[in-house]
Curated annotation (Swiss-Prot):
One of its GO terms (biological process) is translation. This is Large ribosomal subunit protein uL4. NCBIfam families: rplD_bact (TIGR03953). Pfam families: Ribosomal_L4 (PF00573). Keywords: Ribonucleoprotein, Ribosomal protein, RNA-binding, rRNA-binding. Residues 45-76 are annotated as: Disordered. One of its GO terms (molecular function) is structural constituent of ribosome. Residues 60-71 have a biased composition (Basic residues). InterPro entries: Ribosomal_uL4, Ribosomal_uL4-like, Ribosomal_uL4_dom_sf. It comes from Caldanaerobacter subterraneus subsp. tengcongensis (strain DSM 15242 / JCM 11007 / NBRC 100824 / MB4) (Thermoanaerobacter tengcongensis). Signal peptide: none annotated. It comes from the Bacteria. Belongs to the universal ribosomal protein uL4 family. One of the primary rRNA binding proteins, this protein initially binds near the 5'-end of the 23S rRNA. It is important during the early stages of 50S assembly. It makes multiple contacts with different domains of the 23S rRNA in the assembled 50S subunit and ribosome. Forms part of the polypeptide exit tunnel.
């Protein structure tokens, strides 16, 4: 079982915690993590892009000039693809990019991501992190105390003020422990998690 220090919000060590091998000590599988990240990003895509074909562009019903005798190339419509303001050939149409990844693959990817954070000493366990009201300054101070350029902050469900405090920071994100995903774990430099959230992660994803 990997042992990691426990800190307070000021960055001072106040103890140690043992993390479960089944969640934080598995072999790091890069290929599976890649699959999970690609799946996550694909599922986020709106897919509302659209272009018009020659049949959908307004106008172009009349033949621009007669077929023969002008010396110019024959044309059937001013909305054909080769014309300016013509339709698009094989352009994008609205589609759903989402697809399902097996639960076991998703879970293995998340465990690999968490284990990589432990291996690279990029995990920071806090004794607690609670805010009485949303304060972005408090989250900024937390990152500064741990020299973190960016961080994912994982808290138990219900810590709404922490989530709101990190919302308008480009280099930080707060996430409930039960909503943890591979993409967010890997995206940020530091993985900051409270002791209570560790227990939830170990229970949900073990």
């Amino acid at each position: 079982m990997p042992k990691v220090p426990v800190y307070n919000v000021k960055g001072e060590q106040v103890g140690e915690i043992e993390l479960k091998d089944s969640v934080f000590g598995v072999p790091v599988n890069v290929a599976v993590m890649h699959q999970a990240v690609v799946n996550y990003l694909a599922n986020q895509r709106q897919g509302t892009h659209s272009t018009k074909t020659r049949g959908e562009v307004r106008g172009g019903g009349r033949k621009p000039w007669r077929q023969k005798g002008t010396g110019r190339a024959r044309q059937g419509s001013i909305r054909a693809p080769q014309w300016i303001k013509g339709g698009v050939v094989f352009g994008p149409k609205p589609r759903d990019y989402s697809y399902k990844l097996p639960k076991k693959v998703k879970r293995l990817a998340l465990k690999s991501a968490l284990s990589s954070k432990v291996r690279d000493n990029e995990i920071i366990v806090l004794d607690e992190f609670k805010l009485e009201q949303p304060k972005t300054k408090k989250v900024a101070e937390l990152l500064k105390n741990f020299n973190a350029k960016s961080a994912l902050i994982v808290v138990p469900q219900g810590e709404k003020n922490v989530e709101l405090s990190a919302r308008n920071m480009p280099n930080a994100k707060a996430l409930y422990a039960n909503l943890l995903n591979t993409y967010d774990v890997l995206k940020y430099e530091k993985f900051i998690i409270t002791k209570d959230a560790v227990a939830i992660v170990e229970e949900v994803f073990a």
